[in-house]
């Protein structure tokens, strides 16, 4: 790296430190949802195997979790594997499931989870996942179920439309069984039929890779979420990029439809 490159790194670090102090002056979002997009495109651009791009994406999740805790952002939800991802090649899907499984095993061994009391939960149709992954998820959720300082949610086998449709089916079954009166269903009761009825709506939804859509992510919950789109691919998403997203959120006036 030349002198100009080193100076650029120094300037970037100074800017990051200044922005961190500025962000800490104002209220941060309680819940951030992140669409972790761009692993494969990043891999193609830098000339590495696509699977290695996914590994770097997994590692980035751990970094961003640290940044959230540094800013005392209590809840973060990562869009890790969508229902649409099942359409990828069987080899890639199998690799991703094993990578996700390894990530949960790492979390179970990670002292940060226990020190910071991080509750880890999966939202999605877990019945679509292989048995070994379902078992690892079950162990992770059971191990962290009493932790409440921070919440890390992973949307796996998740689709927003499917979540709403599944909720409607469950309501219909309960109505037929006489457990509920359909006329009494309101937004709060409907929420109880979602994958996690206790999950607060995200204040901010952030997407990497330059795509400007939410791609079936938390459709019910994101009605009034602020949106932020970053041009960088997920594996190269930096702390400075994250701070810019939070700073942008802080500059907005949320109206909640009013």
Curated annotation (Swiss-Prot):
Protein name: Tritrans,polycis-undecaprenyl-diphosphate synthase (geranylgeranyl-diphosphate specific)
PROSITE patterns: UPP_SYNTHASE (PS01066)
Disulphide-bonded residues: none
NCBIfam families in the cross-refs: uppS
Cofactor: Mg(2+)
Cofactor note: Binds 2 magnesium ions per subunit.
CDD domains, A to Z: Cis_IPPS (cd00475)
Residue sites binding Mg(2+) per the record: 37, 226
Gene Ontology molecular function: any one: ditrans,polycis-polyprenyl diphosphate synthase [(2E,6E)-farnesyl diphosphate specific] activity
Catalytic residues, chain numbering: 37, 85 (proton acceptor)
EC number annotated for this UniProt entry: 2.5.1.89
Any one GO BP annotation for this protein: polyprenol biosynthetic process
The protein's role, per its UniProt record: Catalyzes the sequential condensation of isopentenyl diphosphate (IPP) with geranylgeranyl diphosphate (GGPP) to yield (2Z,6Z,10Z,14Z,18Z,22Z,26Z,30E,34E,38E)-undecaprenyl diphosphate (tritrans,heptacis-UPP). It is probably the precursor of glycosyl carrier lipids.
Family: Belongs to the UPP synthase family.
